[in-house]
């Protein structure tokens, strides 16, 4: 059996007619329209807005405005300036493990990022997760190279 656009039908009971309130007892929702006898919730102009607590100071105004939420998916780096790399020998391949072994870094928790503060006088091959533009320039000026890893 092929389905054609003109033969499509909605499921039984999925499309109910809107209940017309206040149109007599025989209509099923006459008189008080299912809102009860008296009170704010039975009056016209109902319902009250979301968060309304009957005149009491609402929760969203009682609680202080929260600031300084942590940035979601923020990348944290172990940072190291170019000037600290002068302690290494010429032609060394620099990575996180070597820096810990040489005592330049202690207990790094995050990937390595090289910053461009200071002067570099040694030719190195630096492997890091990130470089600033000035750090990359200083490493390449001396004849070294920058390698990215994740």
From Swiss-Prot:
NCBIfam families registered for this protein in UniProt: rplO_bact (TIGR01071)
Name under which the protein is recorded: Large ribosomal subunit protein uL15
Matching HAMAP family: Ribosomal_uL15
Biased composition (Basic residues): 13-23
GO molecular function: rRNA binding; structural constituent of ribosome
Pfam families: Ribosomal_L27A
One cellular-component annotation, GO: cytosolic large ribosomal subunit
Oligomeric and partner information: Part of the 50S ribosomal subunit.
A biological process term (GO) from this entry: translation
Stretches for region Disordered: 1-57
Organism whose genome encodes this protein: Prochlorococcus marinus (strain NATL2A)
Gly residues: compositionally biased ranges: 25-37
InterPro entries associated with the record: Ribosomal_uL15, Ribosomal_uL15/eL18, Ribosomal_uL15/eL18_sf, Ribosomal_uL15_bac-type, Ribosomal_uL15_CS
Record family assignment: Belongs to the universal ribosomal protein uL15 family.
Keywords: Ribonucleoprotein, Ribosomal protein, RNA-binding, rRNA-binding
Superkingdom of this protein's organism: Bacteria
Known role: Binds to the 23S rRNA.
Gene3D superfamilies: 3.100.10.10
């Amino acid at each position: 059996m092929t389905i054609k656009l003109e033969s499509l039908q909605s499921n039984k009971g999925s499309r109910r007619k809107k209940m017309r309130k206040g149109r007599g007892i025989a209509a099923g929702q006459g008189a008080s329209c299912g809102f009860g006898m008296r009170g704010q919730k039975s009056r016209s102009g109902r319902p009250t807005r979301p968060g309304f607590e009957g005149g009491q100071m609402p929760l969203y105004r009682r609680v202080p405005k929260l600031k300084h939420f942590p940035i979601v998916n923020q990348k944290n780096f172990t940072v190291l300036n170019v000037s600290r790399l002068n302690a290494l020998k010429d032609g060394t391949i620099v990575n996180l493990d070597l820096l810990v072994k040489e005592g330049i870094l202690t207990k790094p928790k995050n990937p390595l990022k090289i910053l461009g503060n200071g002067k570099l006088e040694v030719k190195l091959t630096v492997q890091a997760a990130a470089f600033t533009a000035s750090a990359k320039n200083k490493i390449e000026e001396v004849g070294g190279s920058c390698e990215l890893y994740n």
